[in-house]
Amino acid sequence: MILLAPVSSSEDFSELHPQKVATNYVFTEGPAWSRDGYLVFSDIPGNKLLKFTPGEQPAIFRDNSNGAIGNSFDMQGRLYTCESHSRRITRTDKKGKVEVLAERWQGKRLNAPNDIVVRRDGQIYFTDPAFGSQQDTRELDFCGVYHISHRGEIDVIAKSKTRPNGIALSPNGKILYVTNSDERNVRAYDLDRNGGAPNERVLISNIAGIPDGLKVDESGNLYIAANQVEVYSAEGQHLGSIRSYDTPSNCAFGDPDFQSLYVTARTSVYRVRLNVKGSVQY
């Protein structure tokens, strides 16, 4: 990976030295860094959640993951997972107990939850598109962006015929960002105190490639996995591209200082050191 343009006028990322930290998987996705010092990521066809601790070999975090894709941690260190095969959202506590948080909307099964983020106050947001054979078994006639409240109530933030994919929050937790793989854009939603999203708008259009997962740094810049990792400002200005050896699916900031960007890309996971810290909600 080589960053082709600086992320901001005051920083130069023209020389980066990527490191392949895990490989020989089928299709990696859903990286999420735990404050306990390790990265969790999914191997979707392998039906596993993996755990990578720097300096150690990757290990199985959870076998038979029900087609896990996106992952996110909360303030209590619990792991939230989008299970595409079982079509549900689960939460795994630090003892390994798995709890189902969402699997239906108005009595109908979700399509196939894809990506998820948890705000500092515990509000949960996730995308629910349908790809491939999932489209043939759908019970809902739309793809959605959902919100789960503190009380476990599920609301639809947005409905569409096209497919939302990656999801992330601004550093202050007041803006929700969602990529759309069909429209090749990123939509932004202003969030209120209760987690609702009253103001929807297109922030970024005509992304090079098919946008997938995304993350945000502490300055509010967006890192979008597409043909490469495309970097945009919070205002939607394209700032640069992190060239990838394989097509990236997602990314996450990690390491104790949150200045490493972990990128899942096909069979492997890569790590790139940056001069900016990632924004995390936990």
Residue ranges, per PLM feature:
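Blade/loop signatures of beta-propeller domains
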Residues: 4-17, 36-37, 46, 139, ...
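A short helix->beta-strand "capping" segment at the edge of beta-propeller domains
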Residues: 11-26, 56, 200-201
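Short, solvent-exposed loop/turn segments at conserved positions within beta-propeller repeat blades
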Residues: 44-45, 84-85, 131-142, 181-184, ...
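Beta-propeller domains
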Residues: 39-59
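Short loop/turn segments immediately following beta-strands, especially the blade-tip
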Residues: 189-196, 274-280
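A short loop-to-beta-strand structural motif that recurs across blades of beta-propeller domains
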Residues: 48-50, 88-90, 143-146, 185-187, ...
